[in-house]
């Protein structure tokens, strides 16, 4: 299975996508689900995070101005242990990136 995921066609197909991290993670899941012969219900369950939180963080700057920052937290799946990953502090972070990180941490910690 791992050998198949390292083939040029698999990574080339992903690189030709718009590089939305969550879409890449779901495509990786789809490929692994085919190889593992997962049923559609299990694949669908693993394709979505259990919980996604979006927060607004108002912050008073040194000059008195108030800026509102958006934060994201994704909890993908805790079936094989506690939730991990899914947090990133960066001005350009997207909710799709955080969801992908939480999905990848699920795979990493489950194996």
Task: Show the residue positions of the predicted features.
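N-terminal ligand-binding/catalytic initiation module
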Residues: 2-4, 8-111
């Amino acid at each position: 299975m791992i050998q198949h995921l390292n083939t040029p066609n698999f990574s080339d197909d992903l690189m030709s996508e718009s590089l939305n991290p969550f879409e890449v993670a779901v495509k990786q899941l789809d490929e692994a689900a085919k190889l593992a012969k997962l049923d559609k219900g299990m694949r669908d369950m693993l394709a979505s995070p259990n919980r996604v939180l979006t927060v607004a963080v108002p912050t008073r700057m040194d000059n008195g101005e108030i800026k509102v920052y958006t934060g994201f937290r994704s909890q993908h799946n805790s079936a094989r242990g506690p939730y991990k990953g899914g947090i990133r502090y960066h001005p350009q972070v997207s909710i799709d990136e955080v969801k992908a990180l939480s999905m990848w941490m699920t795979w990493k910690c489950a194996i």
